[in-house]
Every structure is written in C-alpha cells, then in structure tokens.
Amino acid sequence: MGTVKDQLILNVLKEEQTPHNKITVVGVGAVGMACAISILMKDLADELALVDVIEDKLKGEMMDLQHGSLFLKTPKIVSSKDYAVTANSKLVVITAGARQQEGESRLNLVQRNVNIFKFIIPNIVKYSPNCKLLVVSNPVDILTYVAWKLSGFPKNRVIGSGCNLDSARFRYLMGEKLGIHSSSCHGWILGEHGDSSVPVWSGVNVAGVSLKSLHPALGTDSDSEQWKDVHKQVVESAYEVIKLKGYTSWAIGLSVADLAESIMKNLRRVHPISTMIKGLYGINEDVFLSVPCILGQNGISDVVKVTLTTEEESRLKQSADTLWGIQKELQF
C-alpha cells in the first residue's frame, strides 16, 4: 500500500518549478506587509518572496499569509533572510530601512538607509539580475539613485515609488472638495516625494475641464478658495498619520501594488514616479525625481514631457538641487 498521496494521485509529468511572475518584498515592516497583502489581493504574482533580517517576525508574517492561501491566488509564498529565496524575481520591492520618526524629515533618514542598501542591493542583483527594482524606502528619490548606483542596472529598471502616493492623496483631497470620486479628479504632483513636491495646477482637471481656466487664481496665494491648502495637506498628511498611528502603511501599500500591476501586466500606464531626469528641465545632475512615466514590463520606457510654468520649473530645479546637495555627500 502506497501513501495516501500515491493512492490519490498519479504523477504524469516531472515539472521544473521555475516561477514566471515572481515578486519579492524586502522588509516586512508595516509598509512591506501592506505592499505584500495589496499585491496578493491583486493576483499579480505566482510566487511571493519575503526577506528581512528579523527571522521570527519574518517567519510569522509568512505563515500568517500562507494561512490565507485559500482566499488568494498566489500558490507559493516563501521567506528567508537568505536572498537565494528571491531568485528569478521579475520585480523586487524594497521597503527595508530605518523608519521616519514623528516630526522627522524623510531626508534625515538618508545615511542610515544607504548603509542598509549596501547590503541589500548586491544580493538582489546576484539572484535576479534581470529584475525591476521598485524602491519605496525613504527618502525615496535619493535611495532610488543609490539603488541605481549600487545595482549597475540600466535606469529603466530602477524605479522609485515617488509621487504616485502624493498624487493619489492630492486626487483624494480634490475629490473630497468637489464631491467627486478621486479617479475622476486629475492632477499631478511631481518632484521630490516629500516636502518640496510640486503641484502642477495647470493640469488639474475634471472631465478635461481645467480648474485653472475656471478659476485663474487656483493654487496661488490670492486664491479665495485656498486650493494651495490641498497641496499643503498632501505634504503634511504623512506627518499627521505618523503622529496619529506611528507610521503610514495602507495607502503606500496600495500605491505600490498599483505600480506593480502596471509592470507585471505591461499596462504602459502613466504614473508620477521617480526616475533619472538628467537633461530635463535644465537639470544636469544624476538626480531622481518624479515625472509622469510610462510604466510597463521593462520598467520605465518613456517620460512624458510636461509643460511647466516658470515657477513650477524653478521649484523642480530647487528640488533637484536640494537632493543633489545630499547625494554628493553620500558615502558608498
């Protein structure tokens, strides 16, 4: 008598078990796990790998997700602190790093997180040399540059989550103000993910109707409706959430899954994400900033050339200068 399995199943094919749509999430903190569950619930991967340095937490998070397998369509969920577990990933999401404290600027995290990246990036490259890297850790624009430098990857394959979330926050707040669902409220926030981000008021519209054409003072200091406060709220929102609950997680997780979907399904949707923008808007340094990018299976294939006002362009340039000032001091 064979085992129950032998009696039940006749094997007719010896299969090679290589994944075709594998995604890795590095870092299983609040952000990493929000990314993981959001990716799982969008059915984007046939294998999900989790990596972290805290082994008990890592195993616990993996088991907790595995126990939900019946309700998911991702047949393999694995984890290890050994990067061999990440082999053959199509997409690697990096959320590992020091967490922003209450009132702390994202830029303040930089050297701590650079040191962490020096260990992570070479390991990812070793096991998934053809993957796309999606950097989420803050300060995201600088760390995307760091990941690009450390990986040796072409710039199309190194992507920062950038202003995808800032723009989503903006569209939510705009929707609240107008009583319209955020998917029908269009507006782009570009530049640094953080305090010096730039709202492009000229492009803000509903159904193609420019709000600036209806209300020329939109976004200026002389605006009686104070639309500028909408952008101010976007900038302050992360700080407020951190103050209230200690960290942000759900919105960034959903934002990352949105980007992962465009990559894994080769959707070629346009997202405000961090890419190398040297040569645009009079920027001559290797700076990563958010501009609208076409995102698909090869990562960022194209950049949309946005018409900016003189003020918007100078604010973008200022953002770039701030970031370059920090980047050039970094110890690799």
From Swiss-Prot:
The modification N6-succinyllysine is found at residues 5, 118. Pathway: Fermentation; pyruvate fermentation to lactate; (S)-lactate from pyruvate: step 1/1. Its EC number is 1.1.1.27. Signal peptide: none annotated. Pfam families: Ldh_1_C (PF02866), Ldh_1_N (PF00056). Interconverts simultaneously and stereospecifically pyruvate and lactate with concomitant interconversion of NADH and NAD(+). The modification Phosphothreonine is found at residues 18, 309, 322. It comes from Monodelphis domestica (Gray short-tailed opossum). The modification N6-acetyllysine is found at residues 5, 14, 57, 81, 118, 126, 232, 243. It is found in: Cytoplasm. GO terms for molecular function: L-lactate dehydrogenase activity. GO terms for cellular component: mitochondrion. Substrate binds at residues 106, 138, 169, 248. Homotetramer. Interacts with PTEN upstream reading frame protein MP31. PROSITE patterns: L_LDH. HAMAP family: Lactate_dehydrog. Its main location: cytoplasm. Belongs to the LDH/MDH superfamily. LDH family. The lineage of its organism: Eukaryota, Metazoa, Chordata, Craniata, Vertebrata. InterPro entries: L-lactate/malate_DH, L-lactate_DH, L-lactate_DH_AS, Lactate/malate_DH_C, Lactate/malate_DH_N, Lactate_DH/Glyco_Ohase_4_C, NAD(P)-bd_dom_sf. CDD domains: LDH_1. This is L-lactate dehydrogenase A chain. NAD(+) binds at residues 29-57, 99, 138. There is a cross-link at residue 57 (Glycyl lysine isopeptide (Lys-Gly) (interchain with G-Cter in SUMO2)). The modification Phosphotyrosine is found at residue 239.
